[in-house]
């Protein structure tokens, strides 16, 4: 590009070559956008007020204070009716994907979106389960292809498909739920990654919020909304799977430290998370 950028970012066309540096990395948070001072304040409060609890072993699903806070947050922002007992926390969605495979079984056919997030398919394949690639159109995953490939579990991102950005309309969401209800043992993994940053149009309800057959396992993470290094993710199990989960996988230790869990719980409960999301929406719009 011919020209130069002077100190106040004004562009002047003076015939000289000018280079721009553009960061296209999708999972990075600029240091200026993270509320370090607030996070540090809450960490100090947790150390003082939760010193005994910090030394206790957390339940395998995570500390109840954070799970209650997430449950309330989901009701307020995703119209989801959940009980804290349905929520399982873990260090990253990859860890939760592995738990789901062990929970539902290695003998099922797992369907992923094509195109889609490459790591999801890699995780399924590394667990030696059959993984089918299902095409996506302008409304999301194609339901007829799920039947054609004899899928048992559909792993989808209906609120913000990666990499196309497609948002699955309500009509298609009901089609997907209908597919899951037609055969016993079918489930939908709703990956709601990045749903906080819907910048245009009216919000669409989470698939889990309109699921009356208990076939949706909802997954989300704070890696995008806060920072990728804050490895706190969670899933919401159907009530019918809670007992199965603890009978099969209750021996696992929670992979998120008590310290981070208590800090995040306060960050959400005290309203800082909502303020942060609103500020980041404005940042991304501009």
Language-model segments: what does each one mean?
Residues 34-38, 199-202, 229-231:
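Short aromatic-enriched loop/helix-cap "lid" or pocket-rim segments at secondary-structure transitions
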Residues 13-15, 79, 185, 208-209, ...:
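Short secondary-structure boundary/capping segments
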Residues 28-31, 161-163, 194-197, 251:
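Short histidine/acidic/glycine/proline-rich micro-motifs that form metal-
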Residues 1-44, 250-257, 265-268, 274-286:
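N-terminal basic, amphipathic alpha-helical segments
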Residues 43-185, 195-196, 202-214, 284:
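Conserved core of the PLP fold type I
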Residues 39, 212-282:
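Conserved core segment of the aminotransferase class I/II
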């Amino acid at each position: 590009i011919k020209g130069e950028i002077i100190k106040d970012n004004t562009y002047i066309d003076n015939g000289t070559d000018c280079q721009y540096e553009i960061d296209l990395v999708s999972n990075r948070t600029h240091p200026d956008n993270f509320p370090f001072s607030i996070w540090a304040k809450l960490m100090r409060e947790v150390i003082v007020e939760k010193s005994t609890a910090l030394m206790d072993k957390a339940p395998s699903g995570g500390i109840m204070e954070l799970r209650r806070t997430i449950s309330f947050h989901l009701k307020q922002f995703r119209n989801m009716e959940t009980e804290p007992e349905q929520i399982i926390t873990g260090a990253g969605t990859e860890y939760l994907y592995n738990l789901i495979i062990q929970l539902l079984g290695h003998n099922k056919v797992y369907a992923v979106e094509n195109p889609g997030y490459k790591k999801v398919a890699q995780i399924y394949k590394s667990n030696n389960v059959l993984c089918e690639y299902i095409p996506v159109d302008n409304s999301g995953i194609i339901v007829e292809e799920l039947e054609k490939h004899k899928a048992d579990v559909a792993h989808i991102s209906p609120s913000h498909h990666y990499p196309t950005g497609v948002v699955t309309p309500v009509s298609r969401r009901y089609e997907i739920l209908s597919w899951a209800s037609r055969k016993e043992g079918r489930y939908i993994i709703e990956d709601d990654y990045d749903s906080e940053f819907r910048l245009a149009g009216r919000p669409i309800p989470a698939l889990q919020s309109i699921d009356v057959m208990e076939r949706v396992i909802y997954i989300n993470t704070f890696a995008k909304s806060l920072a990728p290094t804050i490895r706190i993710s969670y899933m919401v199990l159907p009530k019918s799977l809670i007992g199965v989960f603890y009978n099969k996988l209750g021996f696992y230790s929670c992979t998120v430290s008590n310290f981070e869990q208590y800090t995040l719980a306060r960050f959400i409960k005290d309203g800082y998370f909502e303020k942060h999301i609103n500020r980041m929406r404005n940042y991304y719009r501009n």
